């Protein structure tokens, strides 16, 4: 199948790292210099809505790069190189190459080679953590993440303020909270960051509206739940789309799911 230019870039960069492919008996079945003679047939299937703010590009491109790396037996020339390649397909795909808590480092080099993802804590660090995903709409959004970010970069003063003064301190706070399993702080930071992201969208000219009325109801329900418990137990976050991810601990998952099902029953329920 035909893939876009960003996918072609990932494929080209992985080919550069290709090594001999060896079978289980140690026999070389493809020499690294022979890979140039091979074409790649790619089939990508996503069980989640695509282009709806649920990180379909991150998941797809991370899977794409990871699979290619295994196929070509690619060997990194420096730690994190595969995440740098995934970043060229989709920025957030770099973070999706690992589980757990992952930081995408901005980097300082002109060629972007040090803009890589780094795993801060693996997926086993906080086993009680859960994510309740609320699919508000499976329709593709009107404004893509890429075009939206570019418009915000050009027109939103709030984005510059966020980049200059908010991001780095907040990242450090969130990492500390996650490593300490401090859900109260983690949840507050998560929700505040989501709020600011969508404030930037509205500060953009013309404004971008990713959330809808159902999204706002999810926020209100999380606030009601948190008020009831007198602490943060349901931490919402919205990416570039109307669909919600609610972080919570295992003990509170049944209540959160019951509340959401009560207000948003499944068709036919």
Predicted feature residues:
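Fold-level recognition of mixed alpha/beta catalytic cores in primary-metabolism enzymes, strongest
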Residues: 59-63, 74-76, 85-150
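ATP-binding N-lobe of GHMP and related small-molecule kinases
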Residues: 1-52, 66-79
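C-terminal nucleotide
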Residues: 121-269
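Short alpha-helical patches at coil-to-helix transitions and adjacent helical residues
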Residues: 4, 58-65, 215
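Short, well-structured alpha-helical segments that form the helix of a local strand-helix-strand
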Residues: 79-90, 184-193
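Short coil/turn connectors at secondary-structure junctions
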Residues: 36-40, 77-80, 98-99, 128-130, ...
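Short, hydrophobic/aliphatic alpha-helical segments
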Residues: 36-47, 86, 217-229
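Active-site nucleophile and cofactor-binding loops and adjacent substrate-binding regions
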Residues: 54-56
């Amino acid at each position: 199948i035909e893939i876009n230019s960003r996918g072609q870039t990932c494929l080209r960069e992985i080919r550069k790292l290709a090594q001999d492919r060896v079978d289980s008996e140690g026999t070389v079945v493809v020499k690294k210099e022979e890979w140039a003679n091979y074409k790649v047939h790619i089939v990508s299937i996503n069980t989640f809505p695509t282009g709806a703010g649920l990180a379909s590009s991150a998941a797809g491109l991370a899977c794409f790069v990871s699979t290619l790396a295994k196929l070509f037996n690619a060997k990194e020339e420096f730690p994190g190189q595969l995440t740098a390649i995934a970043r060229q397909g989709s920025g957030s795909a770099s973070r999706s190459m690992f589980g757990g808590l992952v930081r995408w480092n901005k980097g300082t080099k002109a060629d972007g080679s040090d803009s890589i993802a780094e795993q801060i804590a693996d997926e086993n660090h906080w086993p009680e953590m859960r994510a309740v995903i609320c699919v508000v709409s499976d329709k593709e959004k009107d404004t893509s993440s890429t075009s939206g970010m570019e418009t915000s970069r050009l027109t939103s003063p709030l984005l510059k303020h966020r980049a200059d003064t908010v991001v780095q301190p907040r990242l450090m706070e969130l990492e500390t909270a996650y490593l300490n399993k401090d859900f109260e702080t983690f949840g507050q930071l998560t929700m505040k960051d989501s709020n600011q992201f969508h404030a930037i969208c509205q500060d953009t000219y013309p404004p971008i509206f990713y959330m809808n009325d159902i999204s706002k109801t999810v926020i209100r329900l999380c606030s009601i739940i948190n008020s009831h418990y007198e602490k943060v137990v349901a931490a919402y976050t919205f990416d570039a789309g109307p669909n919600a991810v609610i972080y919570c601990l295992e003990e509170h998952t049944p209540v959160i799911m019951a509340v959401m099902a009560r207000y948003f029953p499944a068709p036919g329920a």
